[in-house]
């Protein structure tokens, strides 16, 4: 039996269609505590957690929890079984986190984004970087990068932005050097440099093939800003599930002799961070930990690998 430190409020749970034979239509979604428990149990909705005991301080669930960290002997088919379990846990987490992040009001995301960029631009690693890789943000549910893109260019740094292209099945991306140094705040041309770029299947602008042929090679990017659905204090990251960043980073580091370049700086919303001193996000040996995690209220430097 698993006990939480405090009772999840019904108003915070979006995926419970029924509880104690009553119907609820809550306004927001589950706390991260509840989400991670459901993911560990392999549940698609929180009804299957079967609440059985409540008190003013404790909330109990009857299902056993599969630990995030598994030994090779804990599953009959060894590492393959562990990899399958991790994959399923991540799938469950993504499903529920997309609901959680998609319900954050846009004005709150804008507020948090400003704080995140203030923290990132204060990092000595940013000041020392000659080149920065930075994503263009999705319409909802993640840190907004519009002003950050302008700031990087305004600081005289070389900027690289992602391009996935049309072959989505390959799940590969390049980072393309931005030649245009216009700022969205330029009085003569208020439009951002990417205003006429085509949008991909996620409604994210990306460089067309004729904008620039300068594709980032090993050693070109000093600092890479990485998005994600969730992060933890051990540098764990949960991405969208396609592996674009993991493949790109692995290629850059492999080509660079495994030197650790570029520096990986994750940026996340308050609602995307899993508290705790130990790893909270399930990761396989193919998943790469972040070096720094930047949040609205702090920056976490990951001291050791997972």
Question: Where do the model's predicted regions map?
Answer:
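Surface-exposed, charge/polar-rich loops and edge strands
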Residues: 2-13, 28, 40-87, 99, ...
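A residue-level signal for conserved active-site and pocket-lining positions in enzyme catalytic cores
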Residues: 97, 134, 159, 225, ...
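N-terminal active-site beta-alpha-beta segment that forms phosphate/nucleotide-binding
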Residues: 2-6, 18, 37-220
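Low-complexity, intrinsically disordered tandem-repeat tracts enriched in small/polar residues
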Residues: 30-37
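Short, surface-exposed, charged loop/turn segments at secondary-structure junctions
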Residues: 176-179, 238-245, 284
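Hydrophobic, well-ordered secondary-structure segments
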Residues: 94, 113, 201, 242-249, ...
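Short Gly/Thr/Asp-enriched flexible loops that form oxyanion-binding sites at enzyme active sites
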Residues: 143-150, 235-250
């Amino acid at each position: 039996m698993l006990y939480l430190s405090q009772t999840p409020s019904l108003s915070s749970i979006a995926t419970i269609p029924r509880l104690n034979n009553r119907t609820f239509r809550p306004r927001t979604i589950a706390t991260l505590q509840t989400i991670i428990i459901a993911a560990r149990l392999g549940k698609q909705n929180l009804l299957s957690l079967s609440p059985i005991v409540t008190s003013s301080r404790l909330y109990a669930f009857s299902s056993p929890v599969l630990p995030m960290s598994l030994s090779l002997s804990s599953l009959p088919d060894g590492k393959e079984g562990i990899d399958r379990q991790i994959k399923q846990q991540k799938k469950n987490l993504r499903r529920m986190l997309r609901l959680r992040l998609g319900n954050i009001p846009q004005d709150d995301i804008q507020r948090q984004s400003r704080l995140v960029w203030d923290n990132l631009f204060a990092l000595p690693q940013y000041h020392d970087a000659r080149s920065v890789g930075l994503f263009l943000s999705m319409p909802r549910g993640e840190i907004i990068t519009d002003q950050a893109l302008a700031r990087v260019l305004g600081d005289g740094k070389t900027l690289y932005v992602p391009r996935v292209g049309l072959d989505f099945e390959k799940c590969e991306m390049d980072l393309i050097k931005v030649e245009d140094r216009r700022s969205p705040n330029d009085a003569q041309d208020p439009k951002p440099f990417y205003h006429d770029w085509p949008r991909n299947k996620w409604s994210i602008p990306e460089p067309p093939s004729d904008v620039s042929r300068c594709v980032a090679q090993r050693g070109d990017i000093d600092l890479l800003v990485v998005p994600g659905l969730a992060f933890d204090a051990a540098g764990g990251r949960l991405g969208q599930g396609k592996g674009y960043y993991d493949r790109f980073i692995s290629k850059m580091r492999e080509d660079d002799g495994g030197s650790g370049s570029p520096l990986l700086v994750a940026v996340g919303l308050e609602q995307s961070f899993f508290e705790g001193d130990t790893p909270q996000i399930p990761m396989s040996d193919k998943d790469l930990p972040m070096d720094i995690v930047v949040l609205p209220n702090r920056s976490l430097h990951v001291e050791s690998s997972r």
